[in-house]
C-alpha cells in the first residue's frame, strides 16, 4: 500500500494518514525506509504520472510531495539545511543556475549519466538532467478565432487585441518563466536593448503574471487567456488528454530549450531511497515510461521516444541558447525585469 499527499509550501508536512495507517503492519524502521519526501515544481499531471510509476516500481513506497515554485523550494531547502526535511527535488533545477545550489544537494549522479545526450550531461556533479523544457505558446484557438488573429510569434503578442489576455509565470521565482525570458534573450540578443524593449512592450500590453507555472497552459485551455508563454510539456499533456481548443505554437522567430534536473537533498532523511528513485527516473526504462504517459521526449539516448503530439525537431526553428551567458547574467536580467515590471505597475 502506498501513500501520496500533495501539499503546498504553506502547509506542514503531514506524515500520517489513512495510507500510513493501512500499512500499520510494517515496523517503524521499514516504514521510514519506504517514505520519500519529494519537493517538486512539476505540474499536477507530471506528479500524478510519477506517483503511478513509482508505485509500480517501488511497492509500498510512501510518497509525500511538497509542491511549489523552484525559487520557493530551493529557499525552503536552504532554510532547512540544519535539519533537512526533504529527500529529493524534481523539476525547476535549470542547468543555467550552475553551482548556485552546490551546498544544498548531494554531489551524486546516477549510474545512467552516460546515457544522457552529451550536451546535457550534468554540469555540476549533482544535477541529474532528466528532461528538456522547450519554450512554446499555448494558444486558445476559439478565442484566437474570435479576435481574428493568427498567432505565430513574439511580434504577434504585441497586438492591442491581446491586451490583458496573455499570461506567463513570474521569472523571479518560476523556472518556466525564466526559461521564457531566456528564449527572448536568445531571439532578440543577450542583454540587448532590443530584448529589453520587447519585454517592456509585452508588459505594456498588460502581460498577466500567473501565480504558478501551470496557469499559462491550463488557464488558456479554460478560456481565461488567449495565449500562455509556457513550455511544450504542459501543452502536450493537454493535447494528450484530449483538449481540442488549444494549439502548441513555437515562436516563428525561434525557440530553444532549457535542461532541467532532479537532485538528492544533502543530508535528507532517506537519501538512499531518493537515489534509487532518481536512478529509475534517469534509466532508459523510466525515461520512456514517463514519455509515453505525458507525450514528450526525454533525455535518454538508449531508447529514443517520438511523440505524436510534437513535431519533428527539424520542423522547428531553433535558436542557440547561451547557457554560460544566462548563468553569469541571471541576476542582472532579473533585476532589469523587476525594474520594467515595476514601471508598469
Report the location of each language-model feature.
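A ligand-binding cleft/hinge motif common to bilobed small-molecule-binding domains
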Residues: 95-100, 221, 225-245, 294
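Mature extracytoplasmic/periplasmic domains
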Residues: 255-256, 260, 265-321
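Extracellular/periplasmic bilobal clamshell ligand-binding domains
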Residues: 308-345
Amino acid at each position: 500500500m502506498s501513500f501520496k499527499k500533495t501539499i503546498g509550501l504553506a502547509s506542514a508536512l503531514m506524515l500520517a494518514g489513512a495510507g500510513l495507517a493501512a500499512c500499520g503492519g510494517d515496523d517503524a524502521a521499514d516504514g521510514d525506509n519506504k517514505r520519500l519526501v519529494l519537493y517538486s515544481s512539476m505540474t499536477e499531471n507530471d506528479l500524478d504520472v510519477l506517483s503511478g510509476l513509482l508505485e509500480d516500481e517501488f511497492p509500498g513506497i510512501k510518497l509525500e510531495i511538497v509542491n511549489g515554485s523552484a525559487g520557493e523550494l530551493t529557499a525552503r531547502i536552504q532554510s532547512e539545511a540544519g535539519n533537512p526535511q526533504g529527500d529529493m527535488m524534481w523539476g525547476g533545477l535549470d542547468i543555467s543556475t550552475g553551482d548556485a545550489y552546490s551546498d544544498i544537494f548531494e554531489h551524486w549522479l546516477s549510474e545512467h549519466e552516460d546515457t544522457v545526450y552529451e550536451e546535457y550531461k550534468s554540469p555540476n556533479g549533482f544535477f541529474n538532467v532528466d528532461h528538456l523544457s522547450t519554450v512554446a505558446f499555448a494558444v486558445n484557438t476559439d478565442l484566437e478565432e474570435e479576435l481574428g488573429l493568427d498567432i505565430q510569434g513574439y511580434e504577434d503578442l504585441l497586438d492591442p487585441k491581446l491586451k490583458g489576455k496573455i499570461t506567463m509565470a513570474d521569472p523571479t521565482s518560476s523556472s518556466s518563466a525564466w526559461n521564457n525570458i531566456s528564449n527572448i534573450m536568445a531571439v532578440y540578443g543577450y542583454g540587448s536593448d532590443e530584448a529589453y524593449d520587447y519585454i517592456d512592450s509585452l508588459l505594456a500590453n498588460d502581460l498577466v503574471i500567473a501565480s504558478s507555472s501551470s496557469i499559462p497552459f491550463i488557464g488558456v485551455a479554460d478560456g481565461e487567456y488567449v495565449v500562455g508563454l509556457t513550455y511544450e510539456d504542459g501543452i502536450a499533456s493537454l493535447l494528450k488528454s484530449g483538449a481540442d481548443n488549444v494549439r502548441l505554437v513555437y515562436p516563428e522567430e525561434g525557440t530553444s530549450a532549457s535542461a532541467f534536473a532532479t537532485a538528492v537533498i544533502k543530508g535528507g532523511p532517506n537519501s538512499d531511497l531518493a537515489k534509487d528513485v532518481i536512478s529509475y527516473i534517469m534509466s532508459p526504462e523510466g525515461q520512456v515510461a514517463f514519455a509515453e504517459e505525458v507525450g514528450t521526449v526525454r533525455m535518454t539516448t538508449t531508447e529514443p521516444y517520438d511523440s505524436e503530439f510534437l513535431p519533428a525537431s527539424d520542423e522547428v526553428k531553433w535558436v542557440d541558447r547561451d547557457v554560460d551567458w544566462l548563468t553569469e547574467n541571471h541576476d542582472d536580467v532579473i533585476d532589469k525585469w523587476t525594474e520594467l515590471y515595476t514601471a508598469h505597475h
